[in-house]
């Protein structure tokens, strides 16, 4: 997934966000009284058989959904709240069925809910960040051809076709090591520094709410989820009958006319993206639409008129020296400008905050902590009760680092063992910086650390092996930094729901194991059934091409760019930095309207249609909030989850039918009269 999911959905005005972080901690007085009066079960009883089963089911379903979203657009919304909601729905339904059948069912606690959510998110998180639509897919032959077979730096030897065996092995050796990096610092970051981790805290508040709000509201959420899940699934089934061959069906409906359709401006009736638009913030969705208008509405039609002047008119439309090169590298410039600025900003915030703490300067979070000291002490006591030994963390990290140093070069001979060792020497400090920054700002910078590693490794390895080494090394660094950050966010959730850290760590391990097995299988379900990486098809996988061309830039430098593309890249890079500066330095009423450059970059390659889908979702939420804000607040996650899961689940039978050679019977197409 490529867009940093936690990041693009949380940056709608940092002043508002800071207030929200503090208000989250001041909510639910009844919840805390109830929790303080209840005996917390030992960590071994917080992990249940039914909890593991439900987490696997949710994790598998979400892995398929995330894989589809990744391979189509690269935009995957944060599904943590959906996972918590589904866990509550499944287990509550299970419990009620057992009770009506005369069986005794164990009460469903917030700790078990937290465990299920953690495990499911760990599972689908590998589908989001495992590189199946970016750095790993960027190694295949199709992406090599799209990048330009005659392009300097794009060596014919830099190809590795996807394989179930090597992909599964790669995931197992790079994903687990991140779980051990920051375990020794959990007390420092959660208890001593009191970092907020807004995503983890928000999930905890949601889970606490499920278990205290009463049956009436929970029933409404369940009914809303089931209603829209059924509608979305049946709609996907209905659409399938009319999608006989390429460019057929409702997904190609020329909503705004055939001229607009040729420039990808149409509504494709995707309930998945409508649901994703309901979860993503208005700023994200409008940034996507702005990027679509800027690219397919203005730039690409203008550049197309320069065919024969700026680039030869006899080139294939997907040749990197034609207009396609501008699409790829301008989107790369936006992403790098946004990422570099955010990286420097978070680094500065982290250093400034550490310096302030060393000087014992009070801050707002400390004041909140003093006001709720009794509650905090109860949470801290529970959080510190089940200690994870230091020797366990150190031995786990060293063991997986040693295994990875041996296995990764066997999978990718171009990535030498000493590069792996150097990466793991720096990984703990990078992981700490990233996790600390995420605790303050809720921005997970793992992808940016990965991109830096990609450029460095690609540059030092050389032309023949640089692309493969850079892409593989990118995954190595990104996985360690990302997994450790997500675990720390989950520790924050555990702290607030009074769940044992040992139970959380075990849940992460379970989810990671399942994810390492399920994610490659779900990827190959799509890879075998659909035309993955086709720029004109549904599954464009834009980030595979973006990452490969980043590696080529690292190897070759700017000679890989088409005519005048470098100057345009400077402009877009500067625009990305400028937008961020304006957002941070101007008042919130101005800064909150600044677009997100990374979100703007996605339609450059994918097209405008999915941005329109997302904006339909944001329009639904906007109108709903105007009509009944209170109802919208607790129903939007349920309805959006239903829309995403319904059509997402239909993908499974659709893929099976495609593998079996069963084609839709009707082709619905629209032609000019």
UniProtKB/Swiss-Prot annotation:
Instruction: Tell me if S-adenosyl-L-methionine is a UniProt keyword of this record.
Output: no
Please summarize what the entry says happens upon disruption of the gene: Plants do not show visible phenotype, but a decreased iron and nicotianamine content in seeds resulting in a transient defect in germination.
One Pfam family matching this protein? OPT
Residue ranges annotated as transmembrane are 46-66, 71-91, 119-139, 163-183, 225-245, 260-280, 283-303, 328-348, 392-412, 420-440, 442-462, 467-487, 510-530, 558-578, 604-624, 642-662
Please state, per the UniProt record, what induces or represses the expression of this protein.
Slight induction by manganese, copper or zinc deficiency. Inhibited upon iron deficiency and induced by iron overload.
Keyword flag Repressor: no
Bias category Basic and acidic residues: which stretches? 1-13
The protein's location, in the record's own words, is: Membrane
Primary localisation category: membrane
Q: Where is this region: Disordered?
A: 1-39
Mark out the compositionally biased spans (Acidic residues).
14-34
The membrane topology term of the UniProt record is: Multi-pass membrane protein
Give me the Gene Ontology terms describing cellular component: plasma membrane
Q: State the tissue distribution.
A: Low levels of expression in leaves and shoots, but not detected in roots. Restricted to the vasculature, in the xylem parenchyma surrounding xylem tubes. Expressed in pollen grains, in the vasculature of petals and sepals, in the carpel veins, in the style underneath the stigmatic papillae, in the vascular tissue of the funiculus and in the chalazal endosperm.
Q: Which InterPro entries match?
A: OPT, YSL-like
NCBIfam families, sorted = OPT_sfam
Function according to Swiss-Prot or TrEMBL: Involved in iron loading of the seeds. Acts probably as a transporter of iron- and metal-nicotianamine chelates.
User: Which family is annotated?
Assistant: Belongs to the YSL (TC 2.A.67.2) family.
What is the designated name of this protein?
Metal-nicotianamine transporter YSL1
Q: What is the lineage of its organism?
A: Eukaryota, Viridiplantae, Streptophyta, Embryophyta, Tracheophyta
Q: Which gene encodes it?
A: YSL1
